[in-house]
Amino acid sequence: SVNVSVQVGGGIRDLYSVRRLLDLGVTRAMLGTVAVQDPELVSRVCIEFGSDAVMVSVDARDGFVSVSGWTSNSKLPASQLVETMREAGVQTFQYTDISRDGTLTEPNYSAIIEMVAQTDGHLIAAGGISELGQLLRLAELGASGAVVGTAIYTGDIDLAEAVDALSQVGG
């Protein structure tokens, strides 16, 4: 038995789905497109299950939110979505610069700095992470976490080394 928190996102569009996930033991439901299309639902989720049970995924290209699996770009600034969701009761956010996701370039530090400030540090950063030094910089900037996929898959980041290094800096 492993004690691990599980966060699930993708296709969650109603209160029933959130309830079902939480009943199964999921720690947090990650809401994306629905946060743009039905902000009232996000507010209801926060009221019914508490703000710890939800995270909003802010997927952005050039500072504007993308929805529907990144297939549709909106005219909604990412910062405005965060503001609206904070008013709805959301505390934790994931920010992905989708133009960098999977590219092994580097994170969009300027956007992440803004998002960290706007979320009081309750931000998980994603997109473009390619090396351990970038994870350490994200921790220094105040991000509470990071999503690393491609860099672990390619071997550019050793997971055990990253966990050890980040634990030493409190990240």
Regions found by a protein language model. Name each.
Residues 19-22, 26-101:
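Conserved anion-binding
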Residues 1-7, 39-59, 104-131, 170-171:
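Alpha-helix-loop-beta-strand connector modules within alpha/beta enzyme cores
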Residues 43, 83, 113, 136, ...:
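Active-site phosphate/pyrophosphate- and oxyanion-stabilizing loops and adjacent acidic/basic residues
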Residues 102-104, 132-135, 154-157:
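Short active-site-adjacent structural elements
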